Structure formats: structure tokens, C-alpha cells
UniProtKB/Swiss-Prot annotation:
Residues 145-237, 244-328 form the Ig-like C2-type domain. This is Poliovirus receptor homolog. Residues 21-343 are extracellular. Belongs to the nectin family. It comes from Chlorocebus aethiops. Keywords: Cell adhesion, Cell membrane, Disulfide bond, Glycoprotein, Host-virus interaction, Immunoglobulin domain, Membrane, Phosphoprotein, Receptor, Repeat, Secreted, Signal, Transmembrane, Transmembrane helix. InterPro entries: CD80_C2-set (IPR013162), Ig-like_dom (IPR007110), Ig-like_dom_sf (IPR036179), Ig-like_fold (IPR013783), Ig_sub (IPR003599), Ig_V-set (IPR013106), Nectin/PVR (IPR052659). Pfam families: C2-set_2, V-set. Contains 1 copy of a cytoplasmic motif that is referred to as the immunoreceptor tyrosine-based inhibitor motif (ITIM). The phosphorylated ITIM motif can bind the SH2 domain of several SH2-containing phosphatases. One of its GO terms (molecular function) is cell adhesion molecule binding. Disulfide bonds join 49-123, 166-221, 266-312. Glycans are attached at residues 85, 120, 188, 237, 278, 307, 313. It comes from the Eukaryota. Residues 1-20 form the signal peptide.
Length: 417
């Protein structure tokens, strides 16, 4: 049946088919190319395609062909004798193929990359005697987005409002935006067509309830895209406008007539900054001993006790707020407790105990020494004691002595007799 079909085919077609069939026993050739190539919108991109011939294999390449899936005809052809032919000569170019050279490199360069260029392309080598070999390459068209982040200045509203805005403009595919914040809140993200066809602009808002504690704090917008080596981080410092928050410091509840000048300070937080400070009392203007100096109030020494409530009123562009503080100036500091302090008494007691202990030890050693000396003297001079006893009483008395003492004195006694 195969011979019947072959007989029915035209001779020229049979010749072409024979050229495309590899002879038995020949080594296989390989077309090498990446499965996907990225390119940026408006730039040029190269679709690499190479013919790998094994060992000593003899291969003759007669033609290189590029085509796109879904389209009829070829977009670029390079013939071994006729040279290149392009469907769009100003946008296409063979990178290495030249007349008179071995056609092993079919890489194709595309200029002015457009969104519609994205697709699947086929690189084809027509060889002899191995036949045709091809490979498919996916061209991915990217657009690198431009990213910005800005603060949304707000006032105290009591309800959630956008406080920061992050925009990724003209990305293909759309960028992915996330937020990082320790202040709470939630994102609101939307997409819209970009300025260039096929691109997308992503806008993300960070929403929370504004407060004075949020003012000056920061949130971070994180933008991720295929064209970035790493995510882009954009930090936004928040701005919340609010009227002054006021307090008075400097009074320690321990002021007396004898002390030096004292100072009260009006502490105010606001955005925008305070524009004025006004000091007064609940009774009206300041007394003579109080002198206002901007955010400070100087209290001069007084000669009589006072009990006054001072008021500090602070204003800014959004309004005014005030704080009150009652100050008492007393006759004098509390008197020190009579007598010695407990610490001094404790040290004195410890000193006395140590002294008595040392005296006791000294007396003990002194008496012990005297006892030893008395016994020694008594043993050496018994006659003196006897003489003293006879002189005092008018008669002679003999005292007992130890054998050792008697024996030591015998020679002397005998000699005397």
C-alpha cells in the first residue's frame, strides 16, 4: 500500500521527502533553545536557537526558518544561497547567520518589542541528510512598573480613612502590593489600564482610624514583580493633623516659702505646631509672683502661703486646648524628727557592743596572765610570805609547800642550819 501511495505522488515531492528522511544508522542532531525568553516592552530581545551536531557527523544546513504559532507563513527565513527574508525587515534580524558560513546559529533578534509579540515561536533547521529539526520558544513580554508611595494627610475623623497611597504604574503583568504596619489598618487595592497598551497600574491604599498616636509613625509598601530581582520597599511617614494635647509639669507637691524660684512647663503636642501659649488662673490674671515666659511659668519666692490653680491654654491652626494644675506654697518644710536618726542609733549600739566585747576579751587575758604570774612568784619566794606573816602576827607560821619546792630548797636549809 505504501508503494501504491508513493507511485501516486509527484516525483518532486518524493524527492523532498527522501531528503527529509534520515538514512539508517545516522546520529541524531539536536536543536538547543530555552523554553521561555523574557523581553521588556519597547526594548529588543534575542530568541536564541542553536543546532548541536554530535561527533563527526556530517550535516549540511540549507535553510533557517522562524514562524509563530497561529499564523500562516514564516516571519523570518535565511537560505544558504539567497540570504535572509523577513516579514518585518525593520524589526527582525538574524544575529549570526551569514552567507558563506555554516548555518548552525539561527538566533533571531526582535526590535521594538510590543505586547502583541508575546507568544509561542518555532525555530526550524532544514538539514541534509538528517532532515528538519525544530524547537518551540515562548516569548514573554514584560513591562517594568514604576513605583511611588505618598502620605495622605488627614485630620481626626473618628472613622477609617486612607492615610498612605502606593502606586505601581505600567506593569506587565500587574505588580503585587502588600503593606507592613504595626499600627493596625487594612489595604484597599485596585487596578486600572496603564498608559501603554497591555500594561496595568495598581493602586493600594492603607486605611485606618487616624489619631495623634499615629502621627509621625511609618508604614511600608512592598511591591513585587517578575522584572524585579528583589521586592521594592517604600516607607511612608504618616501625617495626622490634630489640636493641642496639653499637660503641665514641674510641680512636685513640695513647694515652701523658703525655697528658690520654681518653674512650671506647659507641655503641648499638636500638628501643626502650637502658635501660642496663654497662662492664667481660675481667679483671672496671673498673680505678681508668677511670670509667663512662653511655654514656661516662673514662680518667684513668696512671703506667705498660697493655693492657686494655674491654667495653660495652647492654640494651633486647628483649635485650642488647656490644662490646669493647683499649686500650694506652704510655710516651711516638715521638721526633722527630734533625736538621732535610727541609722545613727544602730551604729552606736553596734559600736558599744563591739567595744564591750573587746574589753571583755582584754580583761580575760589580763586576769589569766596575772594568775600565772602570782603562782610563779608564790612558788619561788615562800620565805618572804612567811616572814611577812610572822612580822604581822608576832609569831612564825609555816606554810605548806610542794615537794618540788621543798626538794629544791633542802640544800640551802641544811647549809643555814
Amino acid at each position: 500500500m505504501a508503494r501504491t501511495m508513493a507511485a501516486a505522488w509527484p516525483p518532486l515531492l518524493l524527492t523532498l521527502l527522501e531528503l527529509s528522511w534520515p538514512p539508517p544508522g545516522t546520529g541524531d542532531i539536536i536543536v538547543q533553545a530555552p523554553t521561555q525568553v523574557p523581553g521588556f516592552l519597547g526594548d529588543s530581545v534575542t530568541l536564541p536557537c542553536y543546532l548541536q551536531v554530535p561527533g563527526m557527523e556530517e550535516t549540511h544546513v540549507s535553510q533557517l526558518t522562524w514562524s509563530r504559532h497561529g499564523e500562516s507563513g514564516s516571519m523570518a527565513v535565511f537560505h544558504q544561497t539567497q540570504g535572509p527574508n523577513y516579514s518585518e525587515p525593520k524589526r527582525l534580524e538574524f544575529v549570526a547567520a551569514r552567507l558563506g558560513t555554516e548555518l548552525r546559529d539561527a538566533s533571531l533578534r526582535m526590535f521594538g518589542l510590543r505586547v502583541e509579540d508575546e507568544g509561542n515561536y518555532t525555530c526550524l533547521f532544514v538539514t541534509f541528510p538528517q532532515g528538519s529539526r525544530s524547537v518551540d520558544i515562548w516569548l514573554r513580554v514584560l513591562a517594568k512598573p514604576q513605583n511611588t508611595a505618598e502620605v495622605q494627610k488627614v485630620q481626626l475623623t473618628g472613622k477609617p480613612v486612607p492615610v498612605a497611597r502606593c502606586v505601581s504604574t505600567g506593569g506587565r503583568p500587574p505588580a503585587h502590593i502588600t503593606w507592613h504596619s504595626d499600627l493596625g489598618g487594612m489595604p484597599n487595592t485596585s487596578q486600572a489600564p496603564g498608559f501603554l497598551s497591555g500594561t496595568v497600574t495598581v493602586t493600594s491604599l492603607w486605611i485606618l482610624v487616624p489619631s495623634s498616636q499615629v502621627d509621625g509613625k511609618s508604614v511600608t509598601c512592598k511591591v513585587e514583580h517578575e522584572s524585579f530581582e528583589k521586592p521594592q520597599l517604600l516607607t511612608v511617614n504618616l501625617t495626622v493633623y490634630y489640636p493641642p494635647e496639653v499637660s503641665i509639669s514641674g510641680y512636685d507637691n513640695n513647694w515652701y516659702l523658703s525655697q528658690n524660684e520654681a518653674t512650671l512647663t506647659c507641655d503641648a503636642r499638636s500638628n501643626p505646631e502650637p502658635t501660642g501659649y496663654n497662662w492664667s488662673t481660675t481667679m483671672g490674671p496671673l498673680p505678681p509672683f508668677a511670670v509667663a515666659q512662653g511655654a514656661q511659668l516662673l514662680i518667684r519666692p513668696v512671703d506667705k502661703p498660697i493655693n492657686t490653680t494655674f491654667i495653660c491654654n495652647v492654640t494651633n491652626a486647628l483649635g485650642a486646648r488647656q490644662a490646669e494644675l493647683t499649686v500650694q506654697v506652704k510655710e516651711g518644710p516638715p521638721s526633722e524628727p527630734s533625736g538621732m536618726s535610727s541609722n545613727i542609733i544602730i551604729f552606736l549600739i553596734l559600736g558599744i557592743v563591739i567595744l564591750l566585747t573587746l574589753l571583755g576579751i582584754g580583761v580575760y587575758f589580763y586576769r589569766s596572765r596575772c594568775s600565772r604570774e602570782f603562782l610563779w612568784c608564790h612558788h619561788l619566794s615562800p620565805s618572804s610570805e612567811e616572814h611577812a606573816s610572822a612580822s604581822a602576827n608576832g609569831y612564825i607560821s609555816y606554810s605548806d609547800v610542794s615537794r618540788e619546792a621543798s626538794s629544791s630548797q633542802d640544800p640551802q636549809t641544811e647549809g643555814t642550819r
